[in-house]
From Swiss-Prot:
The gene is FOX4. Belongs to the oxygen-dependent FAD-linked oxidoreductase family. There is a cross-link at H134-C196 (6-(S-cysteinyl)-8alpha-(pros-histidyl)-FAD (His-Cys)). Residues 1-16 form the signal peptide. Pfam families: BBE, FAD_binding_4. It is found in: Secreted, Cell wall. Disruption phenotype: No effect on the levels of ICN metabolites. It comes from the Eukaryota. Disulfide bonds join C56-C119. This is Berberine bridge enzyme-like 6. It comes from Arabidopsis thaliana.
Length: 552
């Protein structure tokens, strides 16, 4: 980049005062060069040297914390494949790219993380950072240039401070582990995060993780009060050392700024007894009408009540027929009696009965939301399944005004065309989400949204991949008239390569602005500026990372 700039300066110095045809060619060359310089941000080119990378790792760690036993060299061995697949949660990406993936570093100590960052950078090797492996597009463990995976799953400690009602959680800990640890300390403390217990805390929190407590308490990043991060120079920084601009960026801006080691989070107070319910309404039972009414009330209900709607395709009432069942899941921070009062007054169309309601502790609600049957032991939240046999694709949208019934019917018609399992998830906004400024953290999707949509499809047969992805694009296109626009907003934690991406080894700023404006809205400029300050050579990058661009 520096050499290109010097070259451009040389051209300008050679321009004569009076332009002739030759000088005009030079002027054109200058302009083209300047455009390329501004449009592409690349790290200084260093030819990848894996041998020196390994040597560097050994030199930068101590005998007390040796790194050699956490290095898995990429080969076709059972050991390496197990290391790769164990935290590859999307079967679409379960086959490693042996031509580009050089090794997996499953760090067990902070020095392993520091050494991996410094040695990868100095030896021209790209770094991908993986905690739980739930990246929808595989960006945390896939690349088309020589790279290593820094796997954080061994760094999973959780320290709850009951008196201060906060906790330190390392990036490799799962949400299930965090929930159990909190419950061991107190039955009336909780953390507002997601429903999948195997998701890693590192990526979930850094992308602005949401969950069923969001209307009452907000999302994960609203409760982060400190963090530990390894920067591009291998330095360990906390909030005080990194500064407020970087601390702001990592709360919702993802992994473009460094490697998150741990988060310090505030815990929230919940009652001893919560109430949950699950009610199904098929199209034949008036599901479309009830869902339309849900759009009118879900974001206006008391903050303590969260009702999400999941339309999905199921077998119809007759053999060979298919229909849509809208599944309403809910959680109320209180007893059944109070919940029934609210529902009878605000949403009687659902026809909720007392027999549908179940009172339980907060920890047991996490089992309910993870679709475990009643009576499942809490210890299952600590499980880390070694493989995932399902391929999936997700997309997201934000809805500002109710989708008309005709629009919903168009969605159902398109869903029937899928050969694979397909569902939508409507998560309501309102409550405290309307009261937190869009600029409070890097996560911008706040006031003005009725609900967020997640589109999901899953399949087992690898031969169904192409058709499943094509159908998702068709469904997304059908939904376009009914969702946000200019830009069409997207949720960063639901990575979607279709909304814009860059090649693995370079970052086109114009392309980055396309996907970046959808994920981060007006916060993108500030994020690019922070990136330019802390990672000017763009070392921490992937197909949808934030480019380093100084913004005046």
């Amino acid at each position: 980049m520096k050499e290109a700039f010097v070259f451009l300066l040389c051209l300008t110095n050679k321009f004569p005062k009076k332009f002739n045809s030759c000088s005009k060619k030079k002027e054109t060359l200058y302009v083209l060069g300047l455009v390329l310089l501004v449009s592409f941000i690349e790290a200084p080119v260093t030819k990848p040297n894996f041998g020196k990378f390994i040597e560097c790792l050994r030199d930068r760690t101590t005998p007390e914390n040796p790194i050699t036993d956490v290095i898995s060299i990429a080969d076709n061995s059972t050991t390496f494949l197990s290391s790769y697949v164990s935290y590859t949660k999307n079967k679409r990406f379960s086959s490693p790219n042996f031509k580009k993936l050089l090794a997996i570093i499953a760090a067990k100590h902070v020095s392993h993380v520091q050494a991996t960052v410094v040695c990868a950078k100095s030896n021209g090797i790209q770094l991908r950072i993986r905690s739980g492996g739930h990246d929808n597009e595989g960006f945390s463990y896939m690349s088309s240039v020589p790279f290593v995976i820094l796997d954080m799953h061994n760094l999973r400690s959780i320290d709850v401070n009951l008196s201060r009602k906060n906790a330190w959680v390392q990036a490799g800990a799962t949400l299930g582990e965090l929930y159990v640890k909190i419950n061991e300390a107190s039955q009336t403390l909780a953390f507002p995060a997601g429903v999948c217990p195997t998701v890693g805390a590192g990526g979930h929190i850094s992308g602005g993780g949401f969950g069923n407590l969001m209307r009452k308490f907000g999302i994960t990043v609203d409760h982060v009060i400190d963090a530990q991060i390894i920067d591009v120079n291998g330095k360990l920084l906390n909030r005080a050392a990194m500064g407020e601009d970087l601390f702001w960026a990592i709360r919702g801006g993802g992994s473009s700024f460094g490697v998150i080691l741990s988060w310090k989070i505030n815990l929230v107070e919940v009652p001893k007894i919560l109430t949950v319910f699950k009610v199904n309404k098929t199209l034949e039972q008036g599901g479309t009408d009830i869902l339309y009414k849900w759009q009118l009330v879900a974001n206006k209900l008391p903050d303590s009540l969260f009702i999400t709607a999941w339309p999905r395709t199921v077998n119809g009432p007759k053999p060979g027929e298919r229909t849509v069942a809208v599944v309403f899941y809910a959680q109320f921070l209180g007893p059944t009696d109070k919940l029934m009062e609210i529902m009878d007054q605000s949403f009687p169309e659902l026809g909720l009965g007392r027999e549908d309601c179940h009172e339980m502790s907060w920890l047991n609600t996490t089992l309910f939301w993870a679709n475990y049957p009643a009576g499942t032991p809490k210890s299952i939240l600590l499980d880390r399944p070694p493989t995932n046999s399902v391929s999936f694709k997700s997309k997201s949208d934000f809805v500002k005004k109710p989708i008309p019934k005709k629009g919903l019917e168009k969605l159902w018609k398109t869903m029937f065309k899928f050969n694979s399992s397909v569902s939508l998830q409507f998560n309501p906004y309102g409550g405290v989400m309307d009261r937190i400024p869009a600029t409070a953290t890097a996560f911008p999707h706040r006031k003005g949204n009725l609900f967020k949509v997640q589109y999901s499809t899953m399949w087992f047969d690898a031969n169904a991949t192409e058709s499943s992805l094509a159908m998702m694009n068709e469904l997304f296109e059908v939904a376009e008239p009914y969702v946000s626009s200019n830009p069409r907003e997207a949720f960063f934690n639901f990575r979607d390569i279709d909304i814009g991406s860059n090649p693995s080894g370079e970052t086109n700023v114009d392309e980055a602005k396309i996907y970046g404006s959808k994920y981060f809205l007006g916060n993108l400029k500030r994020l690019m500026d922070v990136k330019a300050k802390y990672d000017p050579d763009n070392f921490f990058k992937n197909e949808q990372s934030i480019p380093p661009v100084r913004v005046k």
